[in-house]
Amino acid sequence: MMNFFSTRDHDRIVTASQAIAQGLSDEGGLFVPERFPQVDVRALCQLDYPALAAAVVSEYLTDYSKDFLAEAARTTYGEAFGGKAGYLAPVEGDTYALELWHGPTCAFKDYALQLMPKLLVEAKKNLSRTEKTLILVATSGDTGKAALDGYHDIPGVEIAVFYPTGGTSEIQRLQMATQEGANVAVYAVRGNFDDAQTGVKRVFGDKAIAAKLAERNIRLSSANSINWGRLVPQIVYYFAAYAQLLKAGKIAFGDEVDFCVPTGNFGDILAGYYAKQMGLPVGRLVCASNQNNVLTDFLSTGTYTAKREFYKTTSPSMDILVSSNLERLLYHVTGSDAEVAGLMKSLNETGSYTVRPETLAAIRESFDCGWSSEEQVAGEIRARYEKDGYLCDTHAAVAFHVAAQKKRDGVPMVVLSTASPFKFPRSVLEALGHTAPENDFEAMRALEEATGRTAPASLAALRQKAERFSTVIDPAGIAEVALGYQA
């Protein structure tokens, strides 16, 4: 049996079902597994994606039946991903793109958020819980739509999504504002993503709110990557990338592969760390940041400073100054719940913390870092297209630029391509040297004409869909939204 405990309190021990149903520990810590399971990597590399997903996830979700996980993975990673689940595309030499945007909402979040609703429903069955689950989601763009798509019309669940007003692309906003379903709600929040995320976290940590909702038979949960159920499915595609390189004869078994990950909340790259700890021959995990380069500074100096200028960039899903999942890594490296609790207390009270030199050294054994300016992002999009014929979005461009700086001779580099370029058509079109129309749908059509590529049907169809949600609130209003729900 695999148990989980809080990064801030060892004594708070839960099962996988409890961790997924609850989302966040009561004192604000994140749930982490008690150990890293060791797996037969060679055997896993022989499996197709659904079977691989079931095998990896079952190592952690030990209170779920293996038959359930196998069926859940089979139904999740089939037609909805168009046969391209975990697709690895060659780009240049031994640099590859792991294209994670072939799912229903055209972003990597689909890998977790198409499976996670099934995990939540099963968790409630495992725990004999019958209450309504209220899911609160803070999003910088992609998580919101992926969560709405995964959870819409799931029985016994309500979901409310909060995004920073003006802090997403227009396509991302419309994906959320037009979402269908009787159990969904979307709110724009004045401020940036960190304001929205902090507001949601405060609701989770407010015992009075929890008590009032409990009186109505409602329990809070999260679909953000603070929830273990969001993180564990993302481990799978690191194994899938390695398996494809192995099958193509690009590596021999046991050879290291480096991964460069465009990073905001630190969940996607942390999944790579878990894969490495499970035995996958991951070399370097390169953390690629945009102009909001708080993680680059931390990984370089050991000091995390969230109180800094915030930039709205062309890669909005990474416009984040408080990277929640870093807390999990700090726990795994230090092994001390008291130390992590102290660091998070310092971050909350002063906006910064500094880790011990030996902690930073331990992190640097697995992680490297770099960042890209807006000019470098645009240049990378154009260079990849003109040189390699590869069309990428702004977030992948951040990572391609950093990957080129960190590439090791003879070691394959896999860049995680996290979103379709058609989610950010104006930025991509302008990077290619074209004048972009103000309207995103006209820009999408112009990008199709300029590149000969076809926009995903789900994005093009947004133009015909009616907007359902337009409410704008202050961060403090998130609590009022939560308290407005009835069983």
Where are these regions (language model features)?
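PLP-dependent amino-acid enzyme catalytic core
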Residues: 1-487
